[in-house]
Amino acid sequence: MIKLYSSDQCVWCQRLKSYLDSKNISYRELNVRSEQNAADLYRLSGQNAVPVTVIGNTVIVGFDKTAIDRELEKIQQ
């Protein structure tokens, strides 16, 4: 499962969601407005910035297409 930590006001989060949608990739969006989601984000990445994508055991901070595509390829094999 792919998890996407995001916030409503984050432009990069919107771009990342559009990118995943364009590739027909399913993901679970976790809004960091929730205290629990924010705490989980910090535990995973060591920061409070979004977007953060979790693919398998890999945590990707920011909208890094290369890293995202690499991890997506791994789980699609």
Model regions: which residues?
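ATP/adenylate-binding site constellation spanning eukaryotic-like Ser/Thr protein kinases
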Residues: S7, G46, K65
